[in-house]
Amino acid sequence: MGLSRVRAVFFDLDNTLIDTAGASRRGMLEVIKLLQSKYHYKEEAEIICDKVQVKLSKECFHPYSTCITDVRTSHWEEAIQETKGGADNRKLAEECYFLWKSTRLQHMILADDVKAMLTELRKEVRLLLLTNGDRQTQREKIEACACQSYFDAIVIGGEQKEEKPAPSIFYHCCDLLGVQPGDCVMVGDTLETDIQGGLNAGLKATVWINKSGRVPLTSSPMPHYMVSSVLELPALLQSIDCKVSMSV
């Protein structure tokens, strides 16, 4: 880490600032209710949702040649077919997908304490939102949680040539804010993208949000700092700046 004070903080979005996993679970529960009440599925409803969750976790597509709506509707169509058999049911798949999507967007909320933290931090440093993912999906999340006004810039991996952990997207963020990598801190919940990316780009520090308290594998990227909540960040940044002051 360099000897300059922190001038900018890059935040991940999903499961760092908003509870994407929790919102997705709520969406799945609504689909289960739909399948059980309207279509009289029993245990198959949960099996279908479990299959979709696996497909989402392994999702890989080219954003310039494939529509995320088509990809994710197909996840539901395949899961229904694999579970129930019979003819493909695109209409039911679409109903499930849009219910899941709309429900989870309703629950993607920027909590009041997070808003307050961002507001206070922005008085001292520049803030940038750096999120991987499909352009449409991430823009919808940003709109849903209404976080635009808390940041000086927003960068979405799906709109760039490379996503986290590629150094190039971090350098692009630095250019947008007029800062150097050694001035910046990356905050996120994913070691392989947020932390590894910050390390690759030579940022001043990386902060891992480890809500579950899990112990990282020895082969995993090692963050400079680890906290259980993003709300611990202001105190941590003060500590980092104090170390700089003592070193100068």
UniProtKB/Swiss-Prot annotation:
One of its GO terms (cellular component) is cytosol. Keywords: Carbohydrate metabolism, Hydrolase, Magnesium, Metal-binding. Its EC number is 3.1.3.29. GO terms for molecular function: N-acylneuraminate-9-phosphatase activity. Pathway: Amino-sugar metabolism; N-acetylneuraminate biosynthesis. CDD domains: HAD_Neu5Ac-Pase_like (cd04305). GO terms for biological process: CMP-N-acetylneuraminate biosynthetic process; glycosylation; N-acetylglucosamine biosynthetic process; N-acetylneuraminate biosynthetic process; N-acetylneuraminate metabolic process. Its cofactor is Mg(2+). It catalyses: N-acetylneuraminate 9-phosphate + H2O = N-acetylneuraminate + phosphate; N-glycoloylneuraminate 9-phosphate + H2O = N-glycoloylneuraminate + phosphate. Signal peptide: none annotated. Phosphate binds at L13, D14, T131, N132, K164. Mg(2+) binds at D12, D14, D189. Inhibited by calcium. Inhibited by vanadate, sodium orthovanate and phosphonate. Pfam families: Hydrolase. It comes from the Eukaryota. Catalyzes the dephosphorylation of N-acylneuraminate 9-phosphate (Neu5Ac-9-P) to sialic acid N-acetylneuraminic acid (Neu5Ac). May also use N-glycoloylneuraminate 9-phosphate as substrate. NCBIfam families: CTE7, HAD-SF-IA-v1. Belongs to the HAD-like hydrolase superfamily. NANP family. This is N-acylneuraminate-9-phosphatase. It comes from Mus musculus (Mouse). The gene is Nanp.
